[in-house]
């Protein structure tokens, strides 16, 4: 529309301006408020430019009125016509073309355009419902909002808020992502904001707000959320309930038949930390509920009998039947080998410094005197068996008991297998 008028004005000459007249429709302040247009005049191609009262506003009044131009380039015509003719000035064409580019032109002269939808007006920085909560408000005295402690499950369910009136009945239950109402006055009985800039010292538990269970309801109609002073509601602050807002040890009135074992929340609420940085501290001390056992009861480990274990180990390695019952009396008692062939000979007591290889060689030597059919390879096998037993430990070779050997007790197959 603006481009069409500017093109027409550029094509016209100064001589054409004397023949044509235009009307400008000036609106009063009352009509301007009703129409909602930004400027007090509109341009129509059909009708000439008219003044509303048949005259041009004076230059001094033009700046104070809704007409935005300081200079009036029109000369008043006859009162019967009510028309305003252009003054024949060479600079009027450029001035009018500059004015028309600044006009807000409406095709419908009487009715303004419809307002755009909400999705075009909504800001992307913050939600629409939180943008209404900028103005400060005071707590109402009619109803009390008591937030229920959040029960957060691991599956990601939303916590709920219950609104309890003075009669104690829950009237509203919504999720935490509620859309705030449009009227700011209806928010007076929803929340009360505590001022955190009153003192840097943390307040005692008596100064914090009380917690009322939804089953019992509230007995008084006054608000229990204390506000230390006027504080603006920050829409970017998360609508979460810290421990300071929901617990008060003085207002916790347990029922008569409640015991610490039946209601463990009574003892657990008093030991919670008063921390504002964490949104929910109710799940802090769940680890102590995993295992309950008394500290006085101790389960003693069974004592290990190493003597029986060593006896079993030695019995499994021995070639013959061994007797260990008399070994504990004398630790210096060493292996006594009796000669199996001549029982009248003295028993050879082996000193600790003597090697067990000599013992086994003497054994084989006595055994060879009884049975002369031994071959040389049998001696080597017997010596190898003794060496393997000697490598295990010196204690086993020195602590073995007394065992008699007969000629029939030694079995060659047993020696080869071991």
UniProtKB/Swiss-Prot annotation:
As for what it does, the entry says: May play an important role in neural development; the dorsomedial roof of the third ventricle.
For this chain the motif Nuclear localization signal maps to 285-293
Q: Which PANTHER family match?
A: PROTEIN FAM53A (PTHR28567:SF2), PROTEIN FAM53A-LIKE ISOFORM X1 (PTHR28567)
Name by which UniProt lists this protein: Protein FAM53A
Name of the gene encoding the protein in the UniProt record: FAM53A
- Pfam families reported in the protein's UniProt record: FAM53
Domain of life assignment: Eukaryota
According to its UniProt entry, the protein's GO biological process terms are: protein import into nucleus
Q: Where is the composition biased (Polar residues)?
A: 248-265
